Amino acid sequence: MSNKTKLIQQIEAEQMTKEVPAFGPGDTIVVQVKVKEGSRERLQAYEGIVISKRNRGLNSAFTVRKISSGIGVERAFQTYSPLVESIEVKRRGDVRQAKIYYLRERSGKSARIKEKLAKR
């Protein structure tokens, strides 16, 4: 491994200090996002189902989908972005696929995800 690669890994490790809970596709999460309106800054909660997750160190990202006024809204977040204040897992979902894009075509009861029950 070259010095350049080691240096990049060291810098990325320094920036990845945020505590991120373990979550995956199918989980319902609440993301607290910093929103700047004019001169003030406030926190906005974005609650939805994780439909994809990309683990790439500092470049990790995840996509959250929610239904707002009957319309599906998806938003992609960078996991270690300074705009993401916190991530809270509300409910664990039991899915078999890593990317659950099939939820885009579904609505109503067919878009529901079974809850993952804790093992005894």
Swiss-Prot record:
Keywords (alphabetical) are: Ribonucleoprotein, Ribosomal protein
Molecular-function annotations in GO = structural constituent of ribosome
Q: Which residues form a coiled coil?
A: none
Its protein name is: Large ribosomal subunit protein bL19
Supply the NCBIfam families for this chain: rplS_bact
* Keyword Ribosomal protein part of the UniProt annotation: yes
Q: Which GO terms describe its biological process?
A: translation
Task: Tell me its family.
Answer: Belongs to the bacterial ribosomal protein bL19 family.
Q: Does the keyword Ribosomal protein apply?
A: yes
Summarize the protein's role: This protein is located at the 30S-50S ribosomal subunit interface and may play a role in the structure and function of the aminoacyl-tRNA binding site.
Annotated Gene Ontology cellular components are: cytosolic large ribosomal subunit
Looking up Pfam families in the UniProt record yields: Ribosomal_L19
